[in-house]
């Protein structure tokens, strides 16, 4: 049943109908459409469009429909309705007859769909925040169990300074914390109810929109009807948050792929998250991580698509805005799946502690400690930086680590070096000295783990 037609003397061509209809994807808004309709039925009582008895009949029928939808949402797709709004109204009329035709009084599909997608997005935010917390928890627990695992930290993919595997884990906890708070910020901005805005100019009935917003679990009603039906900021914000978080997950995946490589051999991924080769029997490929990295592009693509869709739209509603749904549905599904898979990757990970320590001892990653040592002896840092650079060149030439050079060899470059230099060149010293807040010292890492556990509720 179409919700329009009196203006037309010919039926829509099937080719146009197939092109125009959106039920194949907006069926996912069925619950929100029904819940919004229940709220609207109550508002219509307040302006004497419906009696109390009529509203009760409608609410009963809508609740029955809600139960049916929740038990088998895919059944909706067997229908030929144009969109989810048409489908709900058609099913309601099947249940209560002509009374169902009164429900759309004062309402437009423009404010109806704006409500539906906002309600759906709000529910997704809460679910995604839980999923982000679950990955954070897995990272924190992994960090807690790997505080002893020393490894190289990198810049430019070159060994830079020693860190711990735990410190690496906690870096991603912090990235995810920002993702979590961005979701919360987006929720606050989308928590205004557009229902009652009509097609663009507002409803003709003196409905208390603040009460309607409260009934539908919004903090307030929107303030401008034209903006209310034109606004898709909440979708763009969620796509932006998802894209940035997927970039974080992609970096996590890339690190894991490198750490898992035969060249690094820092970690071993479980058989449960890897696959083999159809030709090379020895292969164990990090497919879970590669797919996380690969799926990042499609989420970012959805953001770019939505920004491009809205950039040139005149106010208010245009059919272009139907394109808002498939992108957000796919992007948030993908983000959720990747968060879940990243946590699964960590579930059985094995850290090769001996190999990470061996790698941390190479590459002169204690060179900065030597520069700081010279500064403590009164050498200006810029001079000490140059001296240590020359010392490293010499050490490379004689195939020694800095910690293996003799005092006499050190003194070729600076006469302030003495036997106490060896105390600061050990891996443990390198870690211990980074003791400012956020640093890699075991004490600070332990504090960061404890703080994160408190923040995400692991101590409960």
UniProtKB/Swiss-Prot annotation:
Q: What is its main location?
A: cytoplasm
Query: Where's it found, cell-wise?
Result: Cytoplasm
Q: Which domain of life is it from?
A: Bacteria
Q: Which CDD domains match?
A: Argininosuccinate_lyase (cd01359)
Reaction(s) this enzyme catalyzes, per UniProt: 2-(N(omega)-L-arginino)succinate = fumarate + L-arginine
The alphabetical list of record keywords is: Amino-acid biosynthesis, Arginine biosynthesis, Cytoplasm, Lyase
One cellular component (GO) term of this entry: cytosol
Identify the pathway. Amino-acid biosynthesis; L-arginine biosynthesis; L-arginine from L-ornithine and carbamoyl phosphate: step 3/3
- GO MF annotation: an example: argininosuccinate lyase activity
| Pfam family name, one | Lyase_1
List the NCBIfam families hit by this protein, alphabetically: argH, PRK12308.1
**Membership in a protein family:** Belongs to the lyase 1 family. Argininosuccinate lyase subfamily.
Name this polypeptide is given: Argininosuccinate lyase
What is the species of this protein? Answer: Actinobacillus succinogenes (strain ATCC 55618 / DSM 22257 / CCUG 43843 / 130Z)
């Amino acid at each position: 049943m179409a919700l329009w037609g009196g203006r037309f003397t010919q039926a829509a061509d099937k080719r146009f109908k197939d092109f125009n209809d959106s039920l194949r994807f907006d069926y996912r808004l069925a619950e929100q459409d029904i819940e919004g309709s229940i709220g609207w039925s109550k508002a219509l009582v307040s302006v004497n469009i419906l009696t109390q008895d009529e509203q009760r009949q409608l609410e009963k029928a809508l609740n029955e429909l809600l139960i049916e939808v929740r038990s088998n949402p895919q059944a909706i797709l067997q229908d030929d309705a144009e969109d989810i709004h048409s489908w709900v109204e058609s099913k309601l009329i099947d249940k209560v007859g002509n009374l169902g035709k009164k429900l759309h009084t004062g309402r437009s599909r423009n404010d109806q769909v704006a409500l539906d997608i906002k309600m759906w997005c709000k529910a997704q935010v809460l679910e995604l925040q839980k999923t982000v917390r679950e990955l954070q928890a897995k990272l924190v627990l992994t960090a807690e169990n790997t505080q002893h695992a020393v490894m190289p930290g990198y810049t430019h993919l070159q060994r830079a300074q020693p860190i711990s595997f735990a410190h690496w884990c906690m870096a991603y906890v912090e990235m995810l914390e920002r993702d979590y708070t961005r979701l919360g910020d987006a929720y606050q901005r989308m928590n205004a109810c557009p229902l009652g805005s009509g097609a663009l100019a507002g409803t003709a009935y003196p409905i208390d929109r603040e009460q309607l917003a409260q009934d539908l679990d919004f903090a307030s009603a929107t303030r401008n009807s034209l903006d209310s039906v034109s606004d898709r900021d909440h979708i763009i914000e969620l796509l932006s948050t998802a894209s940035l978080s997927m970039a974080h997950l992609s970096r996590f995946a890339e690190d894991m792929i490198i750490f898992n490589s035969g060249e690094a051999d820092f970690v071993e991924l479980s058989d449960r998250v890897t696959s083999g080769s159809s030709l090379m029997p020895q292969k164990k490929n990090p497919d879970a991580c590669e797919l996380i990295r690969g799926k990042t592009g499609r989420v970012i693509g959805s953001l770019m698509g939505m920004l491009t869709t809205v950039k040139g739209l005149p106010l208010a509603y245009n059919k272009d805005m139907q394109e808002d749904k498939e992108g957000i549905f796919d992007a948030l599904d993908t983000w959720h799946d990747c968060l879940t898979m990243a946590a699964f990757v960590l579930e059985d990970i094995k850290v090769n502690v001996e190999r990470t320590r061996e790698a941390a001892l190479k590459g002169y990653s204690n060179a900065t400690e030597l520069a700081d040592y010279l500064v403590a002896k009164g050498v200006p840092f810029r001079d000490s930086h140059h001296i240590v650079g020359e010392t490293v060149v010499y050490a490379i030439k004689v195939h020694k680590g800095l910690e293996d050079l003799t005092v006499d060899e050190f003194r070729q470059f600076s006469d302030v070096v003495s036997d106490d230099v060896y105390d600061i060149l050990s891996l443990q010293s390198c870690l211990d000295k980074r003791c400012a807040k956020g640093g890699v010292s075991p004490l600070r890492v332990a504090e960061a783990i404890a703080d994160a556990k408190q923040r995400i509720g692991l101590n409960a």
